[in-house]
Amino acid sequence: MRKIAMLLVFGIFLTTNLISAEEGGKVESKAQEKTMEVAVIQTKKGNIIFKFFPDDAPNTVDNFKKLANKGFYNGLKFHRREPGFVIQGGDPKGNGTGGPGYTIKAEFNMKPHLEGTVAMARSNAPDSAGSQFYICLAPAPFLDGQYTVFGQVIEGIDVVHKIAVGDVMEKVTIEKK
């Protein structure tokens, strides 16, 4: 009788642990399925998709999303390309001097400037960014901590390398991925 009772207790213990492990696995799967918002820049050469860093640059991320959602970037050209360094866009004047009509406070952070890093372009004044952004073509560690890094290309880095001065951002959208 004692052996039967021990087997019963062991069986209940084992069953409880298996159920807990299964439920834990389901919770973990749901966490892994968590979606993120991305920016999709559509060009004739293909799409550039980048994820945001809202914890490192919350106001900058919000500003970019706001501009994209109201169609600000649609039809703008990439006005700058420095081989082996960056491509730059987001200027409605198309010459590097334009913006949305306001500036935002810098959110300098220590996110490294790697290939595909997306950051805000600005003048010499730290709080002069508005809508212009650049995407690194190669690592640029000398920029670290001096510019607001707010994203990283996750798809389309080949497209980034094909962008030339005058290429158009046909449409920029914010999507869930």
Tell where the protein language model's regions lie, with residue ranges:
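Cyclophilin-like peptidyl-prolyl cis-trans isomerases
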Residues: R2-K177
